[in-house]
Amino acid sequence: MSAEAADREAATSSRPCTPPQTSWFEFLLDDSLLEKHLQKPHSDPPPVQLIVQFLEQASKPTLNEQNQVQPPTDNKRNRTLKLLALKVAAHLKWNLDVLEKSLSVPVLNMLLNELLCASKVPPGTKHVDLDLSTLPPTTVMAVTLYNRWAIRTIVQSGFPVKPVKQGPQQPNVMNQIQQEKELTENILKVLKEQAEDSITVLEGALQLKRDFYVHTMRTLDLLAVEPGMVNGETENSTAGFKISSDEMQCQGCYDLGAVYFLQGPTNPSCYEKARDHFFRTKQLVSKIGAASDHYAIDEKRLAGYCQACGVLAPSNVVSQPATPYSQIHNFMKTNNYQGILKIFLEDHLNNSLPDQFRQSVLRELFQKSQQGNGALAELCFKVCACNTVYDILHGQPVTVQFHQLFMKPSKEKIDFLLEVCSRSLMSDQASEASKRKIATFLKNLCLEIEDLQLVFMISSHELFMKMLTDEESKMVVEHLRKKTSRVSMCTKPITSFYDIPASASVNIGQLEHQLILTVDPWRIRQILIELHGMTSDRQYWKVSSKWEVPTIYSGSILGIKDNLTRDLVYILLAKGLHCSAIKDYPRAKQLLSACLELVTEFSPKLRQVMLNEMLLLDIYTYEAVSAQERPPPELISRVRGYLEMRIPDIPLRQVVAEECVAFLLNWRENECLTLQVPASLVQSNPYVKLGQLLAATCKELPGPDSRRTAKDLWEVVVQICSVSNQHKRNNDGRVCLIKNRDSTMGIMYRNELVSFIKKLREPLVLTTLLSLFVKLHNLREDIVNDITAEHISIWPSCIPNLQAVDFDAVAVTVKELVSYALTINSNSHSWLTIQADIYFATNEYSAALNYYLQAGAVCSDFFTKQVPPEVYTDQVIKRMIKCCSMLNCHTQVAILCQFLREIDYKTAFKALQEQNSHDGMDSYYDYIWDVTILEYLTYLHHKRGETDKRQIAIKAIGQTELNASNPDEVLQLAAQRRKKKFLQSMAKLYF
């Protein structure tokens, strides 16, 4: 074979290949294959697809010798395929929620009909004619399951369904879709004709106060082996999956309630039946829970049904507390409109009425008002005002309806509006954000109302004065002053204030207000063009103090000669950065793209600035949306291009480089950081320098060259954690050392370093940084217990100026970093061990033991396998022993002494001598496998006269697997089994 061919073959063999999908006919050839396939966590094909394949193959028509289509033959192959489909459904516990979600109506109809046949229900028999009390349990369950599905399908067909948009299809595919649609409609037609029968059957099933059983894979196998065996082993057996009477009642009542509710519009008495069934379901849910392996009750939908039934069919028997919905419904029927208003006002404290319901009540009141009931006009405004305040508190814009009703404001309207605002903030839980929203609404109201008396009503109100900031109050006062200067002081009152045309200053103010609120680039441009057309000497980028552009950019932007272009660039960039800061990335992209398009025409420098900001935005967007998937090559290339950029005189924001470095580290693009970044950027940007050193260290791990690169990183971090020292003379004349923690000797402050690290997610990078800080922490002079970490040996063992290091800050940093790392991956045994060591070093023994046990659990499948020796080293075991000892759990101490490579008999015997143990004591003896310790326990209990405990110890010694003459393999197996059980019991105790 040539070298080229060998390379090609090696490359092909190294590619990961997806295992082939199991074909349906393979299950016919191997009886045991189906069960093995279903046990897989992500079986391919999935169970529901197998059902479709099996039934599709079993129902395929055949062709005779004359090429005529014949119905499928009843042969062994087809019977086996149908049985396989039933077994898959049995594996899914006959859960209709699962089956309905994945199977079409025709397929599920075929499946349940096969279940009826398998349960010996004669084809063509009317289920309503069957006496369920005399039938075997599995037959009853099959009949019940079919009729539950029938009425559920009827109910589901009553809901509106959004049509699925389909692209162009092949003619044969279109035919199949049309055939399936027609078949579904035919089945639905039959089900609806038999709906009353299905309801009667289910009502009868609810009268059977006994447990039910449904077929499992095992009972179906027995039926296939021996056709005479109808229901498992015997006719009246309880073989199969048990469904309790309460579970059956819960399912049946819920499904019957749904179908009765569907029939309510044509038969109002059905609402009462639905109410009774839903309330019974609610009682059963509180008793047995809303979910099981074979069913699930949607509690939110159930609550909605109960509320609707409480309104449509109020119960005189069951004393249910009147809900706001039912109260409003009754008030609407009796025309008690003040009662409706009272509920709306009270709801501002508890927010129980959703927005859709509020709007529907308002629409109904509007409709009645338009039909001639003029007295409702005032009520419509009041309800609309309540809804408007609710919308404002929930971040929604003010509706057009409110503006229409408030077009001619009056004293009464203002009084009511202020009352609603006050009520909405009466709760102790009213947040500062809610207060700010109401304050902004009232401020805007003052700026919009033309009648000065009404404006003074609002501005002089206690709520207004208490919530507005000084700056906002000044703005309103200035607005009133300007408005007052324009008002004619004649004694004759103006008949219609709305007939006065708006002045130019009013128009400018309105446009500036719109400019502040809008985030549409095109609209911003149009407003600025209008404003500059009115007056060209204003600097409109100063309209809002909230518009902030980084100082490094402002010089280039404010240097633009054309005033309109300057204002537009500044505002677009400021709004784009603001949207990015509040994580509204789509709008930020729209604004920055418009700004990029604008500056491309006249300024290469600003074009590069905008490209950099677009890159930063794309990184933020990617991290927020799909951070788990590898980024597209185009984004990686742009990040590399930014760090490799050598264009002079381009203002660079440090945060862009920081995010780019974090991005490359997270995706292991170490080559770019170590080889391709220009030296000038490394020297000028501390994050680039730190990222380069980190990348170089991670790249060399765990090789011998890692020590060299690690030394450079070590020196940089030590400098960051070092502070300048100052000497101060005390009153007694002695000189003491003062550490100035407000200054640093490094390339950045410690809090900046921690903030940067919290942008990293790559495990190796985090492990490297953790080991560095752990090593630095271990160098402090007063340390008692070292913390362990991976790769700790690559760091230097001493620091020239030890006194300059702020070890308190280092300790805080270690705790911060390990807590952050565990949010990234809570299953890293090395990080869990570091957390445990930290708790151990601070004498928090219970927490330390918890994390030591977690570290073992995550790498042993919760102690079902042996914990790797590199995780539970002798040092870790000794620390666990110390934790148990300090918690007075002395029996646990003795058992853990066996885990050491050399059993520590001295510590074990000393622990067992303690009589104030706070653990299970003799209940732990089954976990001891060392005969010497058990013999000592026997002697100890005999000496103390503790006969019962002595017998337990003797029983533990007498187990045959602990016999000293057994082979080493048997003894090792016995020890491992006891280790696993003991650690599992410890985990249950401390987790």
Curated annotation (Swiss-Prot):
Keywords: Chromosome, Nucleus, Repeat, TPR repeat. GO terms for cellular component: chromatin; INTAC complex; integrator complex; nucleus. A motif (WFEF motif) lies at residues 24-29. SUPFAM superfamilies: TPR-like. Disulfide bonds: none annotated. Its main location: nucleus. TPR repeats lie at residues 250-288, 319-355, 569-602, 829-862. It is found in: Nucleus; Chromosome. Residues 1-22 are annotated as: Disordered. InterPro entries: Int8, TPR-like_helical_dom_sf. The keyword Nucleus applies. The keyword Repeat applies. Residues 1-10 have a biased composition (Basic and acidic residues). It comes from the Eukaryota. Residues 11-22 have a biased composition (Polar residues). The WFEF motif is required for the recruitment of protein phosphatase 2A (PP2A) to transcription pause-release checkpoint. Component of the integrator complex, a multiprotein complex that terminates RNA polymerase II (Pol II) transcription in the promoter-proximal region of genes. Belongs to the Integrator subunit 8 family. Component of the Integrator complex, composed of core subunits INTS1, INTS2, INTS3, INTS4, INTS5, INTS6, INTS7, INTS8, INTS9/RC74, INTS10, INTS11/CPSF3L, INTS12, INTS13, INTS14 and INTS15. The core complex associates with protein phosphatase 2A subunits PPP2CA and PPP2R1A, to form the Integrator-PP2A (INTAC) complex. This is Integrator complex subunit 8. It comes from Xenopus laevis (African clawed frog).
